[in-house]
Amino acid sequence: MQSGKNAAASAKETAANVAASAKAGMEKTKASLQEKGEKMTAHDPMQKEMAREKKEERKHEAEYEKQAAKEHNAAQKQTTGIGTGTHSYTTTNVTGHRTGTGGI
């Protein structure tokens, strides 16, 4: 059962990472297309340079967001496995005391 939970968590992490990569790719493509549009309408070399810099900034931001999402997904996978260890049960219904010793 434990390995099944780990496999499910890994699959979920992989799917989330694929989605993050796809989103970043779309953002980078949109940035490139926007740059081309701005360069076509710009007459001044300075405006063309500003369009290129804006594209680069958007591409870096998309890459940063992708990496942040991957780190978040890895952390989420780790927290999924935390609650799967051994549990202690209480017979006194008092939190913090195992098997009824002390407390009441």
From Swiss-Prot:
State the tissue distribution. Maximally expressed in dry seeds. Also present in mid-maturation embryos.
List UniProt keywords, sorted A-Z: Stress response
Locate the region Disordered. 1-104
Q: Which InterPro entries match?
A: LEA_1
Signals that turn on the gene: By abscisic acid (ABA), osmotic stress and heat shock.
Bias (Polar residues) occurs at 75-89
Return the Basic and acidic residues bias intervals: 25-74
Q: Name one GO biological process term.
A: embryo development ending in seed dormancy
**In which residue ranges is the amino acid composition biased (Low complexity)?**
1-24
Record function comment = LEA proteins are late embryonic proteins abundant in higher plant seed embryos. They may play an essential role in seed survival and in controlling water exchanges during seed desiccation and imbibition.
The entry sums up its family as follows: Belongs to the LEA type 1 family.
Protein name per UniProt: 11 kDa late embryogenesis abundant protein
Origin organism is Helianthus annuus (Common sunflower)
